[in-house]
Amino acid sequence: CVLGLAMGTSAAAGYADTNSRITPWISELAFVPIDLSENAAQDEWSGDIGCAVNYFSQQAVSRLIEPSGLKIDPALGKPEKLILVQEAMEAGDDKAAAIYRTIGTYLGYAIPQFARFYDIKHMLLLGRVLTGKGGELIISKAEEVLRDEFPELGKKISLSTPDEKMKRHGQAIAAASLPEI
């Protein structure tokens, strides 16, 4: 049972069951509430608060820049902000690391909620937010939260992201499967 979560422009998901079949369910996790506090982040599109998209995407990175103390021009677009945060992370900036640790903490606490609806043995994490050292930190922090706060799930659910070689193979397979136009 694999739950895939793409953390990029939004938060997209897909699920394969115990028979390795993709279910016919709509696995749209972007608007699933994961933060039930009154001061949860509000989604700019739906107006809802606490939606996963604000915790596992470029929106999360952008929202966490100011509280981290990282100095990035607020007028930049979310993709550009993400690139600058990634560059800061690769350079060893502790403020950038705080952003990724926070996202990893969010993920660690959200996985048990996802597990209420999906039988998860493996979680495949994808998307641009997971690129580089920041992605590694997100995964390690989420694993730490699972291990410390939800030990049974921590033993049952593994987290991973494909390495660059696997990403390239996946892109080649996808390109080869496209129909001729």
PLM feature segments, named:
Residues 3, 18, 38-181:
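ATP-binding/phosphotransfer module of carbohydrate and carboxylate kinases, centering on a glycine-rich
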Residues 26-44:
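Acidic-enriched catalytic cores of C-N bond-cleaving enzymes acting on peptides and small amides
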Residues 8-11, 33, 129:
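Glycine-rich beta-alpha junction loops
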